[in-house]
Amino acid sequence: MPKRTDIQKIMVIGSGPIIIGQAAEFDYAGTQACFSLKEEGYEVVLVNSNPATIMTDKEIADKVYIEPITLEFVTRILRKEGPDALLPTLGGQTGLNMAMELSKNGILDELGVELLGTKLSAIDQAEDRDLFKQLMEELEQPIPESEIVNTVEEAVAFAATIGYPVIVRPAFTLGGTGGGMCANEKELREITENGLKLSPVTQCLIERSIAGFKEIEYEVMRDSADNALVVCNMENFDPVGIHTGDSIVFAPAQTMSDYENQMLRDASLSIIRALKIEGGCNVQLALDPNSFKYYVIEVNPRVSRSSALASKATGYPIAKLAAKIAVGLTLDEVINPVTGSTYAMFEPALDYVVAKIPRFPFDKFEKGERRLGTQMKATGEVMAIGRNIEESLLKACRSLEIGVHHNEIPELAAVSDDALIEKVVKAQDDRLFYVSEAIRRGYTPEEIAELTKIDIFYLDKLLHIFEIEQELGAHPQDLEVLKTAKLNGFSDRKIAELWGTTDDKVRQLRLENKIVPVYKMVDTCAAEFDSETPYFYSTYGWENESIRSDKESVLVLGSGPIRIGQGVEFDYATVHSVKAIQAAGYEAIIMNSNPETVSTDFSVSDKLYFEPLTFEDVMNVIDLEQPKGVIVQFGGQTAINLAEPLAKAGVTILGTQVADLDRAEDRDLFEQALKELDIPQPPGQTATNEEEAALAARKIGFPVLVRPSYVLGGRAMEIVENEEDLRSYMRTAVKASPDHPVLVDSYIVGQECEVDAISDGKNVLIPGIMEHIERAGVHSGDSMAVYPPQTLSQKVQETIADYTKRLAIGLHCLGMMNIQFVIKDEKVYVIEVNPRASRTVPFLSKVTNIPMAQVATKLILGQSLSELGYQNGLYPESTRVHIKAPVFSFTKLAKVDSLLGPEMKSTGEVMGSDATLEKALYKAFEASYLHLPTFGNVVFTIADDAKEEALNLARRFQNIGYGILATEGTAAFFASHGLQAQPVGKIGDDDKDIPSFVRKGRIQAIINTVGTKRTADEDGEQIRRSAIEHGVPLFTALDTANAMLKVLESRSFVTEAI
């Protein structure tokens, strides 16, 4: 039926900040949906709290609200805008939960707002464990025996009847939060207790474990006329028991017989029809490898991570079509945008294999619990396309950017057999590499399949890769073996290693003998129909389908998988750069490996290459396309690191030149540049070994900040207070980058701020100065940033602007740069300069209304600031106050300490804007899920050096009616200054310690700082962990607590006797 005309205005809810389990795939889905609705002529109102997304750009919807996704604020916007309908299925779990809450509170009925897409009853049936179970029984679809419980005792009783192992799944949580596998009663008690707390409805499902079955997913679509189809099926390399977001996945499924595929396909279609879902839906099934038995695991009645993967794997734009279906269109009326000639009621066919590998944050969290289970831990993922499994798997391995270029981690060769097999059996994030090592040691696929329940088909492929390695080793320079290796996805670098030569020589040999890749098109129909998608992958074969156009082109390098320190912000800058390239009349080509993002949506650029971001893969595209040049400044450290090898190969780097990039990143050159420009920095030195470092620190004086050069997101950065700690740091952390020295700097405790600047080589535009709430020592990505600055004097701001101009001109910056400053006693020091777009670009672009990445790109392509209508210097300030606040994913990462420091830990960000600082802060805290009631108890556990400052905060908390609790030393200090605090016991002091108070719900906030010995703070770690697990606001920086107090004070009344 045609689209609906009885609705005009539609509100779309976004998914909020990026957390583990809910990443950039929702920016992609939301952006697609908004465009899709506007295309049909509807007025679109968007609400999302995440400024780092394309989705929250002004042009995406008719009205964009960057406000907290909470009942209070969404209700306000609904009342103000009065939309006819609400579309919540594109905002992940956040959007769905918000819709449920609005409905339960009667808001939707009161305002007459209709829900589009999927009815609430269907969301309830899919998400509520009990209703789902009833529906499956009605449809006669098998599900594992299970019981809904609301208490720990009920869980223990049920497990006793079906036997262990069992799986615990809390209701209405995201990415398996709070769930897990339990092998015995002790584990069951622990996991269920935590799961019940995390479930908004205090409900868990206890089910029989079917670990070891094959995990298969079907991505299905249905419309209002009951047309339904399968977009794509996918098979997990890892069997059931590991969250699908943490599994390696292949599409299409590889090991099912036709009968099994039809059986599971029918089950998926009957489920989506029974739920009456209109739009996209994801069905997860478990298949017994030894019989035709299967179970339905779960159904996601919304666009999900898997649908982003399915869209990119097939080219079929699920979110775009889900939005069309939501407004009444049917699949047989909508043209498939990929072919431009077939209708969307056409199941995609693939003539290639897609591999997805998750990207984990354990390079940042050395202490994190790496064992995988039913709770998701990956921050992002990579996808690669090839003509066989070996090719797509090896391309995906080198896309991960974890320092490997093959399915091999060289260090594993030294691991003992026993340790190796333990890691093969107990899956961690790097299990693929352990399994590959076991095969290299002669374990057979049969033996490994027995241990891991990974299908023997995949293990045979790993064996095949190993056989090619041996062939290569035995026949150096042999062209036939070289061809075979390239057909199976081997990199030049791996081949060079096996031949004992260099990658350059292998590349030379390939080019001389015309062994070069061809590019194939992703067209949804296995080339059955003509197609017009400019979406390509490389393979070694016959016919090349990517034809170079006559137009001059520019290649933009994306930022690869999302990880801590390099998030969706860089994708944002990439997409904006492409817009500007097109506006300047060039053809824009994107190269990227991340299936979740907007940049890898083929409709964004003129050509998309879905390829690993390595020198070899980029050069292959350059050889074919012969672009005018390559832009590296928007792809984070990933792209910057490719600048030097590309320039050496004669490629034109557009924007800041490699020599100048080096002057900003190389310590000695940078110091020299600052001296020449007469700009102060904290005194520092470089050291290449332990003795040099100790010597440097003695000369500068403790405390010092130590870090390796050339890293992103403060990896392996630490503040050390004495020589013993420094020596232990040099022993454990220096391997962070072996051929680059370690920097030892004087650590200045002061006010930190940062600036993004855009330069055309003569003039410099400074959109704004962002002031950090946390003092220096907390990574800029983990600090709350305020724009415009609230406490900086006019003189300091002028100095910052002056230093910024000098640096941009002195370092020959063309395009963007980011500078971080620290201010102490009105004196400004430069801490670091990044000659590229930084993670604050989207936030600053939105609050100043300057499309910074577009402006920078236009300058890179030859325009000047004055031509674009911008003045030299600091841009006029906004009258509203805007705050960027970090969001963390600690609930998902056991054993990771939530203490903030110089190493970045946040996964996402939110923004709060209002007329005053206090109101903006309130919104930022609410949006980042830090909700403090107006009364309650706050507990202080404070290091000696901060007790004075904490006393002042405690008095203010007491003034607004909070009860004060404190650990022994802190309580004694408070008492000696006339403030009575209720003492709490030491850790392990059964009922009287902080964790037990937290469990009983007697504490509303914890303020915990750590002194000089950051290492020996096990009690503090337990306190912080208990806060995270029970959702109690935790402040590890007094500045953040002070900001929260400002909010509470502005919202409370002080009662005093006269």
From Swiss-Prot:
SMART domains in the cross-refs: CPSase_L_D3, GARS_A, MGS
Keywords (A to Z) from UniProt: Amino-acid biosynthesis, Arginine biosynthesis, ATP-binding, Ligase, Magnesium, Manganese, Metal-binding, Nucleotide-binding, Pyrimidine biosynthesis, Repeat
Protein name: Carbamoyl phosphate synthase large chain
Protein purpose: Large subunit of the glutamine-dependent carbamoyl phosphate synthetase (CPSase). CPSase catalyzes the formation of carbamoyl phosphate from the ammonia moiety of glutamine, carbonate, and phosphate donated by ATP, constituting the first step of 2 biosynthetic pathways, one leading to arginine and/or urea and the other to pyrimidine nucleotides.
Stated family: Belongs to the CarB family.
Region annotated Carboxyphosphate synthetic domain, chain positions: 1-401
Domain text: The large subunit is composed of 2 ATP-grasp domains that are involved in binding the 2 ATP molecules needed for carbamoyl phosphate synthesis. The N-terminal ATP-grasp domain (referred to as the carboxyphosphate synthetic component) catalyzes the ATP-dependent phosphorylation of hydrogencarbonate to carboxyphosphate and the subsequent nucleophilic attack by ammonia to form a carbamate intermediate.
Domain ATP-grasp: residue ranges: 133-327, 671-861
Single annotated GO MF: carbamoyl-phosphate synthase (ammonia) activity
Assigned EC number: 6.3.4.16, 6.3.5.5
GO cellular component terms listed in the entry, alphabetical order: cytoplasm
Annotated binding of ATP 1, by residue: R129, R169, G175, G176, R208, I210, E215, G241, I242, H243, Q284, E298
GO BP: 'de novo' UMP biosynthetic process; glutamine metabolic process; L-arginine biosynthetic process
Residues noted as binding Mn(2+) 4 in the record, renumbered to the chain: E832, N834
Catalytic activity: hydrogencarbonate + L-glutamine + 2 ATP + H2O = carbamoyl phosphate + L-glutamate + 2 ADP + phosphate + 2 H(+)
InterPro entries the record matches: ATP-grasp, ATP_grasp_subdomain_1, CarbamoylP_synth_lsu, CarbamoylP_synth_lsu_oligo, CarbamoylP_synth_lsu_oligo_sf, CbamoylP_synth_lsu-like_ATP-bd, CbamoylP_synth_lsu_CPSase_dom, MGS-like_dom
Record domain MGS-like: where: 930-1058
Residues that hold Mg(2+) 2 according to the record: E298, N300
Cross-referenced SUPFAM superfamilies: Carbamoyl phosphate synthetase, large subunit connection domain (SSF48108), Glutathione synthetase ATP-binding domain-like (SSF56059), Methylglyoxal synthase-like (SSF52335), PreATP-grasp domain (SSF52440)
Cofactor(s) listed in the protein's UniProt record: Mg(2+); Mn(2+)
Encoding gene per record: carB
Pathway terms, separated by semicolons: Amino-acid biosynthesis; L-arginine biosynthesis; carbamoyl phosphate from bicarbonate: step 1/1; Pyrimidine metabolism; UMP biosynthesis via de novo pathway; (S)-dihydroorotate from bicarbonate: step 1/3
Region described as Carbamoyl phosphate synthetic domain: spans on this chain: 547-929
Region (Oligomerization domain) location: 402-546
Binding locations of ATP 2: R707, S746, I748, E752, G777, V778, H779, S780, Q820, E832
Binding site for Mg(2+) 3: Q820, E832
Record-listed Mg(2+) 1 binding positions: Q284, E298
